[in-house]
Amino acid sequence: MPNCFKFHTVIERHWQKPYPVLSFLLKPLSGLFAKIAAKRRTDFLSGKRQSEKLPVPVVVVGNIHAGGTGKTPIVAALVSGLQEKGVKVGIISRGYGRKSKAVHVLNAESRAEDAGDEPLLLFRKTGAPTAVGSSRAEAGRALLAAHPDIGLIVADDGLQHYALRRDVEIAVFPAADTGRTDLDLLPNGSLREPLLRLDSVDAVVVSGGKADALFRPSENMFHSRIEAGRIYRLNNPSEILDTGRLKNQTVVAVAGIAKPARFFDSLRNMGITVKRTVALPDHADISAADLPDADAVIITEKDAVKFSDGICTDNVWVLPVCAIIEPDLAAFVLERLEDVPKAV
């Protein structure tokens, strides 16, 4: 794991600030990747490869980056917004990082190894019926069989999963990349599809700030920002942390997410002095034994769901976050669709 993590870190740094030697070596592979990705999409759009349509509208929320765009809070915000408008929403996802390959409809006993950390987090935050599976269509069928009153499905991270037809496509794009001219496809860059793909989606949500003035891939552009909530105790979520009591304590922050620096910065922006930070690979397994010794250990919500059976120590705290999307993305989605049934 350490060597793999180190190599992945080097590649991610290259994606942010390209190294000439690596670019020379990886550029031909990116060209090959581009041809394969383009052919695959063309085959589905032309009907050469079959795609499946579910009996309810499907809204895909994805990205053309290989993760790290802040998509999960945006999916949660969209689902919550649709629920507030009376729509019975379901969520489907691949369930990346889970140990089982079978389709799984989440329930109160579901764990991260059954569902994946992000789907489990979405399920717990929104209360929306959720199913995971490598085939999104199969996951959707299972979800509708278990919850036939669902009127709309949000497909998390399914932009490139063309085997499932979609009624609305939403792409999340990081604000930090809107002014860049050196973006490239995998493996030389972090893109799964070229920037031109943004021209064909229904909406683009720029995450983490304002877009560059020249970035206008879609006439329907939204912006999202992350707001930190009140830190709560992992063992007792109703107990809120008084951050003032941390003044003379040793605080360690642990994050197993794609962009851990954002999490660490959020804590510092709250006035918390972090003695040490621990960055783990995205979706990494984590247990109580992996947590460092400190007066207070603060973790992400995404990591918190991995402790499904609780934890024996009382010094672990969780920082919740939510995405604020402007203008109203849920209203936009409903305008694009017709006759979405409302919950009774």
Swiss-Prot record:
What reaction(s) does this enzyme catalyze? a lipid A disaccharide + ATP = a lipid IVA + ADP + H(+)
Keyword Nucleotide-binding found: yes
Q: Which GO terms describe its cellular component?
A: plasma membrane
From the UniProt record, report the name of the gene that encodes this protein.
lpxK
What is the species listed in this Swiss-Prot or TrEMBL entry?
Answer: Neisseria meningitidis serogroup B (strain ATCC BAA-335 / MC58)
The record's PANTHER family line, in alphabetical order, gives:
TETRAACYLDISACCHARIDE 4'-KINASE, TETRAACYLDISACCHARIDE 4'-KINASE, MITOCHONDRIAL-RELATED
Q: Which UniProt keywords apply?
A: ATP-binding, Kinase, Lipid A biosynthesis, Lipid biosynthesis, Lipid metabolism, Nucleotide-binding, Transferase
Q: Which HAMAP family match?
A: LpxK
Protein name in UniProt? Tetraacyldisaccharide 4'-kinase
